């Protein structure tokens, strides 16, 4: 847990004893106090589907289930093995996928992107470049800030050969 100006963060889960390396990655809740109100973001690591489903179902003795948030940084670059349990549970209004353009792993997986798209808007760094978020008073009936993702720097291309 820590703070820096208007930003607070809290590690919700980081399991160094996880049998799978990806499942040991930290899950961090970040809250930014904006002029339009607080914006919560769940920054997920590379936790895979089974561990994510157990977390969401409350089957962890070391962590509460993930909270509802405004923004979700999607697990494992949108890989298929990240699952959709956390995105469905947190009810984010914006899903961000951090992934390199033309990466050799084929991330994000089409099925993951399709599932996220059914839950709400998806911003991807491979398509949209480096992203920044802004929060403004908006038309949201729940009084929550309107969140917009903006491209700060376009995605770069990778060239091989002469």
Positions of the model-derived regions?
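Cap/insert and terminal regions of metallo-dependent hydrolase folds
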Residues: 52-132
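Core dinuclear metal-dependent hydrolase active-site scaffold
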Residues: 1-71, 127-162
């Amino acid at each position: 847990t820590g703070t820096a100006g208007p930003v607070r963060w809290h590690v919700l889960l980081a399991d160094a004893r996880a049998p799978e390396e990806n499942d040991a990655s930290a899950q961090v809740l970040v809250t930014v106090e904006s002029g339009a109100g607080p914006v919560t973001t769940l920054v997920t690591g590379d936790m895979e589907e089974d561990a994510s489903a157990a977390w969401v179902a409350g089957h962890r003795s070391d962590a509460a289930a993930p909270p509802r948030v405004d923004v979700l940084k999607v697990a494992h670059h949108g890989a298929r093995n990240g699952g959709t349990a956390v995105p469905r549970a947190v009810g984010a209004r914006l899903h961000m996928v951090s992934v390199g353009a033309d990466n050799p792993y084929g991330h994000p997986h089409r099925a993951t992107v399709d599932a996220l798209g059914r839950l709400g808007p998806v911003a991807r760094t491979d398509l949209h470049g480096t992203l920044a978020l802004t929060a403004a008073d908006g038309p949201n009936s729940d009084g929550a800030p309107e969140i917009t993702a903006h491209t700060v720097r376009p995605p770069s291309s990778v060239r091989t050969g002469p």
